[in-house]
Amino acid sequence: MRVGMGYDVHKLVEGRDLILGGVKVPHTLGLLGHSDADVLLHAIMDALLGAAALGDIGKHFPDTDPAYEGISSLKLLEHVRDLIAKKGYVIENIDATVIAQKPKLRPYIEQMEQNVADTLQIAKEQVNIKATTEEWLGFTGREEGIASQAICSLTGLYEASMQVGGGCSGCGGCQAD
C-alpha cells in the first residue's frame, strides 16, 4: 500500500467562478489560477501523484503551458487517473478537506464526492470530502483564499489481487483466489 498527501492554496478574487470538486459554488469571489483553480482537485491530484511517486501537478500541468489555461481540473484528474493506472496502481480511498471561511460548502459536498468518484472511476464510498473554517484566523479566515488538503491510498494491482475478500476496492476487474 502507498499513501500520498496533497496540499493546495489559491487566492480569492473578483471576476472568477468558484469551482470546487468540479462544482460551481455560488459566491461573490472565485479562485485565481491558470486552470479553473479548483483547489480541492489540485490537492487530490497531488496526493495521487505523490502516492505513485509521479511528482506533482506542476510537473504534469505547468502553469506556463497555454494548453492548460482555463481547463477544467476534472480533465486534469482524468489524466492523473490514467497515469496511476498505467503505473499499475488502483485507488483505495481519498480523504480531503477544504478550508474556507465562506461560502458554506455542506450543500455541495455530495456532488463534489460524486464528481471525484466518477472521474476516477471508483465508488463514491471511496471518496470523503469535508469542509472546515479556521475560525476567522489566517488568510482563509480573512477570506483572502481557500486551501485544501488531501490524502489517498493506492494499492498495486498484484497486491490488490491477493487481498482477502475479492481483491481491492478499485475497478472490480480482478478477484482474489
Swiss-Prot record:
Highest taxon listed in the record's lineage:
Bacteria
**Pathway in which the depicted protein is active:** Isoprenoid biosynthesis; isopentenyl diphosphate biosynthesis via DXP pathway; isopentenyl diphosphate from 1-deoxy-D-xylulose 5-phosphate: step 4/6
Which parts of the sequence bind a divalent metal cation? D8, H10, H42
Q: InterPro entries in the record, alphabetically?
A: MECDP_synthase, MECDP_synthase_CS, MECDP_synthase_sf
Its gene?
Answer: ispF
Its UniProt entry gives the catalysed reaction(s) as: 4-CDP-2-C-methyl-D-erythritol 2-phosphate = 2-C-methyl-D-erythritol 2,4-cyclic diphosphate + CMP
Please describe the quaternary structure of this protein: Homotrimer.
Recorded GO molecular functions are: 2-C-methyl-D-erythritol 2,4-cyclodiphosphate synthase activity; metal ion binding
Which top-level enzyme class is recorded in the Swiss-Prot or TrEMBL entry? lyase
User: Where along this sequence does the record place binding of 4-CDP-2-C-methyl-D-erythritol 2-phosphate?
Assistant: 8-10, 34-35, 56-58, 61-65, 132-135, 139, 142
Under the heading Pfam families, the entry gives: YgbB
Which species?
Agathobacter rectalis (strain ATCC 33656 / DSM 3377 / JCM 17463 / KCTC 5835 / VPI 0990)
Q: Where is this site: Transition state stabilizer?
A: H34, T133
Output this protein's name. 2-C-methyl-D-erythritol 2,4-cyclodiphosphate synthase
- UniProt cofactor note: Binds 1 divalent metal cation per subunit.
Keywords, comma-separated and alphabetical: Isoprene biosynthesis, Lyase, Metal-binding
Please report which protein family the annotation says this sequence is part of.
Belongs to the IspF family.
Cofactor(s) for this protein?
A: a divalent metal cation
